[in-house]
Amino acid sequence: MDKPRVSISHSAIDADWARSSAQALKDRGVPVWFDEFDVHPGESIRDALESGLRGSDALVALLDPESRAKPNLFFELGAAIGMGKRVVSIVPKGTDPGSLPPDVRLRRYLVRDSPEHTAEELSNALLAA
């Protein structure tokens, strides 16, 4: 079975963790679309996000406590759901499930650990589907 291609959504505050996670997934052979690797100078970020998502099998949404205030998150979540993509959210430890947006809360999500451990858990979950 081919490994599914994933697109990673994150905020600037989580860029280091997201980069490490993207690299850990790549090290496991999972094809990854990640803005820092795949958006080039002069490109429309929104167009690149949409293109990356269209070419992916799943969206991995890295959430933080302020995610509700970030419109790009909802653009990406809505687009992924509308395209019929699998959506896997990664939330910080100790997150109150009631604080999560309904489209996140109503799907099984992962609790953030080290980028390497989370990438292992994520790649195993994607292959099991």
Predicted ranges, named:
Residues 1-61, 81-85, 93-95, 117-118, ...:
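Conserved N-terminal substructure of TIR/SEFIR domains
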Residues 4-6, 105-108:
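Short amphipathic alpha-helical segments
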Residues 47-51, 76-77, 103-105:
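Short low-complexity, flexible loop/linker segments enriched in glycine and/or proline
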Residues 65-85, 97-99:
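Conserved TIR/SEFIR loop-to-helix hotspot centered on a Trp-containing motif
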Residues 95-106:
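Glycine-rich, charge-decorated loop segments at or immediately adjacent to ligand/cofactor-binding or catalytic sites
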Residues 109-114:
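Short acidic-hydrophobic, aromatic-tinged amphipathic segments that line or gate anion-handling sites
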